[in-house]
Amino acid sequence: MPLNSLGFAKPPSETRVVVAMSGGVDSSVVAAYLADQGYDVVGVTLQLYDHGAALAKKGACCAGIDIHDARRVAEERGFPHYVLDYENIFKDAVIDEFADSYLAGATPVPCIRCNERVKFKDLLETARDLEADCMATGHYIQRKMGPNGPELHCAEDANRDQSYFLFSTTPEQLDYLRFPLGHLPSKDATREMAAQYGLAVADKPDSQDICFVPNGNYASVIEKLRPGAAEPGEIVHADGRVLGSHEGVIHYTIGQRRGLGIGGLSEPLYVVRLDVDRKQVVVGPKELLATRTIPVREINWLGDAPFTSRPEWHLSVKVRSTRPPREAIVRPISETEAEVELLTPEEGVSPGQACVFYESDGSRIFGGGWIWRGY
């Protein structure tokens, strides 16, 4: 029997798929599309947080209005929908680390941790408990079958590609996951499908901010989670001059130029380092932001050969989600640690961000790891 569109040798009606539904247009289209093809669809939405103000905030996933939108799609398309309370799991696995990372002078990426520790771990196990054959999401990334099993590839639409946020997907998870939107040419194509299915979310805005950070105000969330933890200190030039004072390192990120509160200087200055132990924000000229060597740990490797089977890998890497991949040499130190040498220096490389590995002249993702303070 030929394989169905999800890769199983049985009819869609006998193939159960759990769809992770955020209430946005992407996952809603995935659910409607699979239901339309005759699959046994089960929609699941996670209740991740409750910040009051965030509940009715459009453009943030998994708040109250989003649960309502997901449920409405399920009712209209005729498949079951469940809401799971993951608030405690989400706080322990994502929010606490987010706050502690900022206090340690890092710039975290909680969306990666959410995929790694919540959606592709606990939710995936729930999908197995529901006896689903696979789990589908609305992420813009592709799963392709290679000679050694499923591979992770960038989305067809480079502007929507979410590979940076999914580098920690393990081979075992990838075997179970499906990404039906990864091959689409644009977000417009997704919205057209939503309109064809008559979904009320067809024109719903994309999520912009971190879901549990209303209006993008990270500092207020951290102060609420860790009262009094943000300690004032000095703003210091890299040459040692004291230029001013600050209200806590949580208000600053590497590469920041605006809002430093140290006007009247002839040269533009940027945050080049956050010294938490001394409570110092270190600033300097732009050239001090250039970084060539990056220490990376907690590596998730998705190559066919073992990571340590070669002394070095010639790959492309991304050090921020908004940056294009740059050529690099990745030198394994262990199975989970490496030194990454950028062939062209990058500015504003920050501890807490991810360093994601890509095939040099192709679309395949080879995994990645976390940048840490060691340079």
UniProtKB/Swiss-Prot annotation:
Q: Where in the cell is it found?
A: Cytoplasm
Instruction: List the protein's name.
Output: tRNA-specific 2-thiouridylase MnmA
- This protein's species is Ruegeria pomeroyi (strain ATCC 700808 / DSM 15171 / DSS-3) (Silicibacter pomeroyi)
Write out the catalytic residues in the record.
C114 (nucleophile), C211 (cysteine persulfide intermediate)
Q: Which reaction does it catalyse?
A: S-sulfanyl-L-cysteinyl-[protein] + uridine(34) in tRNA + AH2 + ATP = 2-thiouridine(34) in tRNA + L-cysteinyl-[protein] + A + AMP + diphosphate + H(+)
Instruction: Name the cystine pairs.
Output: C114-C211
Query: Which NCBIfam families does the record match to this protein?
Result: PRK00143.1 (NF001138), trmU (TIGR00420)
Q: Keywords on this record?
A: ATP-binding, Cytoplasm, Disulfide bond, Nucleotide-binding, RNA-binding, Transferase, tRNA processing, tRNA-binding
State the HAMAP family in the record: tRNA_thiouridyl_MnmA
Primary subcellular site in the record, as a coarse category: cytoplasm
Q: Name one GO cellular component term.
A: cytoplasm
Residue ranges, annotated region (Interaction with tRNA): 160-162
Q: Which residues bind ATP?
A: A20, M21, S22, G23, G24, V25, D26, S27, L46, G138
Enzyme Commission number(s) of this protein: 2.8.1.13
Broad EC category: transferase
